[in-house]
Amino acid sequence: MMLGLENKLKLYGFNNLTKTLSFNIYDVCYAKSEREQKDYIAYIDEQYNSERLTNILCDVTKMIGAHVLNISKQDYDPQGASVTILISEETLAVKEIDKSCNLGQIDILNTRDTIVGHLDKSHVTVHTYPEYHPDNSIATFRVDIDVSTCGEVSPLNALNYLIGSFDSDIITIDYRVRGFTRDVDGKKLFIDHKITSIQDYIDENTLKRYDAMDINVYQSNIFHTKMLIKEIELQNYLFNRDVYEIKPKQRLEIENNLRKEMIEIFSGTNIY
């Protein structure tokens, strides 16, 4: 379902609504030894470096019908990466764009060791958070993406692409609309599209793989959906190890530990 492209409301002046999508995914992995844990973090750090994240966010920008004005990206030591993209709803002439903006030109980005930029009402950001504890056999990886737009552009249009771009065991999605615009008669409009649930914008085949629940505050235009993977195929959660190397009893124990970790992350509570 595309928003902001069809059945347009007749507005007076600029559409001043700000639409923000906050998208967090968690990937969980069994890594028993310290070596496995460090190897997993190194793998994730390489797999989701700032260059790949930049490509994902540029695709998101195209999908929501916006245009790149500026890219700021950075890889961190010992791990993690961040990317921020300033976007505009309409194409701007080069002479109209602030000289501090790089228009996402790769040759400009490659001439700098550290790249910084500025934010605007319309922007796309991503941060990564690999994590493990030496006393725990489970490592996790979180990706935090924010897409904030003003005008007719809606970040919900890129939701399925974002979900498909990452291996996600737990997904939390927040969507809110702020501000107001006016119709031609001067009546305030606090939202310019119909929505009852974020799940309405998620592919059915994706939803079948997850248990999903909503917490919505309709009068405040706040929508929240969180999703937990239904089936655990153990081989997908082992790092540098074959499932058949593990005894059946230990397999069951590992699956239980993985599920407990996922449930706590999903609920946001220390349960076990």
From Swiss-Prot:
Entry keyword Membrane: no
Catalysed reactions listed for this entry: S-adenosyl-L-methionine + H(+) = S-adenosyl 3-(methylsulfanyl)propylamine + CO2
Gene3D superfamilies: S-adenosylmethionine decarboxylase
PTM description: Is synthesized initially as an inactive proenzyme. Formation of the active enzyme involves a self-maturation process in which the active site pyruvoyl group is generated from an internal serine residue via an autocatalytic post-translational modification. Two non-identical subunits are generated from the proenzyme in this reaction, and the pyruvate is formed at the N-terminus of the alpha chain, which is derived from the carboxyl end of the proenzyme.
Active-site feature positions: 122, 127, 150
Domain of life assignment: Bacteria
UniProt KW S-adenosyl-L-methionine keyword: yes
UniProt-listed Enzyme Commission number(s): 4.1.1.50
Protein name: S-adenosylmethionine decarboxylase proenzyme
Gene name, Swiss-Prot/TrEMBL: speD
